Regions:
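Conserved glycine-rich beta-strand-loop-beta hairpin in the small C-terminal domain of fold type I
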Residues: 281, 297-307, 317-329, 361
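Helix C-cap/helix->beta junction micro-motif
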Residues: 29, 137, 197-198, 313, ...
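N-terminal small-domain helix-loop-helix segment of the aminotransferase-like
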Residues: 2-101, 108, 286-287, 387-391
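Conserved core segment of the aminotransferase class I/II
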Residues: 224-297, 308, 386-387
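Conserved PLP-anchoring active-site segment centered on the Schiff-base-forming lysine
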Residues: 112-134
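PLP-dependent enzyme catalytic core of the Aspartate aminotransferase-like
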Residues: 333, 342-352, 357-391
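Active-site phosphate-binding strand-loop segment of PLP-dependent enzymes
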Residues: 142, 146-215
Length: 391
C-alpha cells in the first residue's frame, strides 16, 4: 500500500473535482446539466490572437524549450499593458514573470516564501488555492472573514498583533472571487501600509480587473506609491482576454518576490510554449476597451437575468460590480451545500456551494456568468419552476 505524504493529507481533494464527478454521474444517466459552477469565459479570444498562434506555430524554430523567464516580447507586452491600463511603470526584466496560468504562480510563490509554522493571512471565502498552497508549504492559515456588512472586505485593522508577528503573506483578491465585491485605492493604501509595517508580502490576485460592470473600473494594488516594495500582483489572460485554456498568467511587482518565484518555478517547470507566448503578447497589444466593454455587457445581461430570478424566488443577492459570479445567499432552511445539491439533482443546474471557498460561504452558492445567455435563461427557468412550483 502506498500512503500519501503528510503534506497532501492536510488538504482535501480539489472541490471542483468532487463536484465535476457528481455532474458526470448525472450526465451519464442522460441528465442535461447546465454548468453554472465553472468560472471560465465561454466566448473566444480576439481573432488576431488565434491567427497569431496559427502563423507562429508553423515556424521550425519555436518547438524547443522556451526558457524559464518568459520571452522579452511577452514581458514587455505585460509591462506596457500595465502602463496603459494602470499608469504603473515596471521593469520587464526584474518585475515581470510570465506564468503557466496564475494558479501555479500562487502555489509556487507560497512555497518560495512560507516556512513550516509561518502564518498566511487568507480571506474567507476565497479561491481555494490560497489556503491549500499555505498548507502544502507547512504554513498555518489565519482566516480574514469577508462579511456582507463590510462590503466583503477584510478587517485589516483588528488582526491580532501576535498573528501579524508570525505572518508572512497577506492574500487579497479584487474584483473578488467568489463574492463579486470590489475594492478601492483607499483600501489598497491601507493594505500596503499594513504590509510595510509588519514586513508582510502582500499578494494581490487580480485576474478580474477587466471583468467589471456598471461603469466600474478596477484598480491595481501597484498603483499605490511604493506598493512594489511590499507587493506582488498576479494577473492572467484567462478572464480578461477569454484565454483560460491557454494557461498564460503573470506575476508583477516586488523584485525579491519575482526572483524567489522564478527560483522555485525553474526547478519545477520549463516555461510556456513559444507560440502561445507570442499570441499572448499579440492579445495584450491588440486588446481594445470597446471589445472589453462589449464582452462585459454580455456578462452584465446574464448577471441581471440571474439577479431577477434570485429576487423572484426570494434569494438574497448583491449586485456584483466585478468578476464572473453572482454570490447568492440561499433560502432559509438550506445550507449552501444542500441548496446546490437540491438544484443540481432536481433541476439539472450546477451551482458551486459556497463552502468550497471557506466556512464564511456555508450559506451561499456561487453562480457563474460564463455560460451562453440562452443556457442562463433556461437554467433560471428551471430554478424558478423548481422553487416557485414547489417541486
Amino acid at each position: 500500500m502506498y500512503s500519501l505524504a503528510r503534506r497532501l493529507q492536510r488538504i482535501p481533494p480539489y472541490p471542483f473535482v468532487v463536484l465535476a464527478q457528481k455532474v458526470q454521474d448525472l450526465q451519464a444517466r442522460g441528465v442535461d446539466v447546465i454548468r453554472m459552477d465553472i468560472g471560465a469565459p465561454d466566448m473566444p479570444p480576439l481573432k488576431p490572437v488565434i491567427e497569431a498562434l496559427k502563423s507562429f506555430v508553423q515556424r521550425p524554430d519555436v518547438h524547443r524549450y522556451p526558457g524559464y523567464k518568459g520571452t522579452a516580447e511577452l514581458k514587455v507586452a505585460f509591462a506596457d499593458y500595465y502602463h496603459r491600463r494602470f499608469g504603473v511603470i515596471l521593469d520587464p526584466e526584474r518585475q515581470v514573470l510570465p506564468l503557466l496560468g496564475s494558479k501555479e504562480g500562487l502555489h509556487h510563490l507560497t512555497l518560495a516564501f512560507v516556512n513550516p509554522g509561518d502564518i498566511v493571512l487568507v480571506p474567507d471565502p476565497c479561491y481555494p488555492t490560497y489556503r491549500t498552497a499555505a498548507l502544502l508549504a507547512g504554513g498555518e492559515v489565519y482566516a480574514l472573514p469577508l462579511k456582507e456588512e463590510n462590503e466583503f472586505l477584510p478587517d485589516l485593522e483588528h488582526i491580532p498583533r501576535g498573528i501579524l508577528q508570525k505572518a508572512r503573506l497577506l492574500w487579497l483578491n479584487y474584483p473578488n472571487n467568489p463574492t463579486g465585491a470590489v475594492a478601492t485605492l483607499a483600501f489598497f493604501e491601507k493594505a500596503v501600509a499594513l504590509a510595510r509595517r509588519w514586513n508582510l508580502l502582500l499578494c494581490h490576485d487580480a485576474p478580474y480587473t477587466d471583468v467589471t460592470y456598471d461603469g466600474y473600473v478596477a484598480p491595481s494594488v501597484l498603483q499605490i506609491p511604493g506598493a512594489a516594495e511590499v507587493a506582488v500582483e498576479f494577473n492572467s489572460l484567462s478572464k480578461s482576454h477569454n484565454m483560460a485554456g491557454w494557461r498564460v498568467g503573470v506575476a508583477l511587482g516586488n523584485e525579491e518576490a519575482i526572483a524567489g518565484l522564478l527560483r522555485m518555478k525553474s526547478n519545477v517547470d520549463s516555461g510556456i510554449f513559444l507560440p502561445i507566448q507570442h499570441a499572448a503578447a499579440v492579445a495584450l497589444r491588440q486588446i481594445e476597451r470597446d471589445w472589453i466593454l462589449k464582452r462585459n455587457a454580455i456578462y452584465a445581461r446574464r448577471r441581471d437575468l440571474i439577479l431577477e430570478t434570485m429576487d423572484a424566488i426570494g434569494v438574497k443577492t448583491r449586485r456584483p460590480q466585478g468578476a464572473l459570479y453572482v454570490w447568492a445567499h440561499v433560502p432559509a432552511g438550506f445550507s449552501g451545500d444542500e441548496f446546490a445539491d437540491w438544484v443540481l439533482t432536481k433541476a439539472g443546474v450546477s451551482f458551486a456551494p459556497g463552502s468550497m471557498y471557506g466556512s464564511e460561504g456555508r450559506d451561499y452558492v456561487r453562480i457563474s456568468l460564463g455560460v451562453p445567455t440562452d443556457r442562463v435563461e433556461e437554467a433560471m427557468q428551471r430554478v424558478r419552476k423548481l422553487i416557485i412550483g414547489g417541486s
